Amino acid sequence: MLFRSVIAAGGGIVAKHGNRSSSGLSGSADIFEKFGYDLNMEPAKITDILEKFNICFMFAQKFHPAMKNVATARKTLGKRTAFNLLGPLTNPANVKNQLIGVFSEEFLDRLPMILKRKGAQNIMTVRSEDGMDEFSTSAKNRICFLKEGKMFTNVVDPEIVGLHKSSLKDIQISTKVDALKSFVSVLNN
């Protein structure tokens, strides 16, 4: 989520499709909602926001109402499932370029190949070696690129790219309030 905000601030266009947290403390929808974003906004209004600010959020339950029927079961399970893969596969903006965090290494190369069949052009999937489904500063990050129809894999070490290596406990949050504070802190620094 944070990485996407930085991309938008740098002039990139971000059409984030997401949901409330089902397996962690805070999902993308939780963060946007805390900032006062209307999760049930109509698509035309979301398009206006994207054109004006280069970033928008599309609440999965608004665009795919059937997902409401599995929300309680997902929360009860408390772990990542195939439903976590549906977001990138069903992004209503039909984006051609995506950065996707995956919860299992087996999806690093599988997800880009599925999206390629749907017309995607440039896809990057990432999973950190400490188990996070996003870039981490506490471990190396395994990435897979789909670019111009070809797949590439690599490992990104935070120290090699000039970042301070942290411990996992330094970046873990324990409450939704902590998640919001951490998000705002990074944006302000």
Locate predicted features.
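Core alpha/beta catalytic barrel or barrel-like domain that forms the active/cofactor pocket
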Residues: A15-S21, F83-L86
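Glycine-rich anion-binding loops and their surrounding alpha/beta cores
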Residues: G11, E33-N40, K45-N189
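Conserved catalytic cysteine-centered active-site region
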Residues: I7-A15
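Active-site-proximal loop->helix
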Residues: S21-D38
